Amino acid sequence: ATDFSAAVNVLKNAGCDVVIACMNQNPLATLMNTMRDVNYNVNVVTSYVNASATTLGAFVDTGAITANRMVYCTAWLDVTTEQGLADYTAFYTAMSAWELANGESGSTYALNSYAMAGYIAGNIFVQALQAVDKAGVELNYANFAKVMEETNFAIPMGGSISYANGDRLGVTALALNCVSLEKNEAGVYA
């Protein structure tokens, strides 16, 4: 949509105290600018797809995000805990080392959410292989599947997944992140 004024006014006039925005960056920009223009000051919850400090920082610059109109992005990773930060540091260190060894900057992939997802998938796979080894059984499809069904796997940087007892529990807890309203000492929003 290119115009959210009617929808925003309906929400504002109904007294809604939070907006859940199921959209990507471009429609979110339109929504946030419309909320700014009609002085609708409630918090917005959206998907991790919008969790870019660059994107959200631009909203701060235009006054679309303010202390009275924050945007909270869901995140299935949480680096605010001691364990989450330790896991992120391990990921960042591994990615930076790989990049530097391959002529890259050392921070390109270490800050990339797709690289994080791949790292986590690989980590879960390695945890499963280690669980097969610990069980002392031959590595084959049947034993791998059996171990996957019996083991709770820790997700680096947050939560766990379990396939035990027929469950298909992926991430069962989410974090909410928001952008700071001021640039840091490097001149960027975080």
Predicted regions and their residues:
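Extracellular/periplasmic periplasmic-binding protein-like sensory domains
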Residues: 35-119
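Stable alpha-helical elements in mature extracytoplasmic
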Residues: 4-7, 24-31, 84-94, 121, ...
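Extracellular/periplasmic catalytic domains that process cell-envelope and extracellular macromolecules
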Residues: 12-14, 37-39, 62-66, 139, ...
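Extracellular/periplasmic Venus flytrap/periplasmic-binding protein
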Residues: 1-38
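Solvent-exposed loop/turn segments at secondary-structure junctions
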Residues: 1-3, 24-29, 49-55, 75-80, ...
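Glycine-rich, aromatic-lined ligand/substrate-binding cores of catalytic
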Residues: 23, 42, 150
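Segments of small-molecule ligand-sensing domains
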Residues: 102-115, 122, 126-189
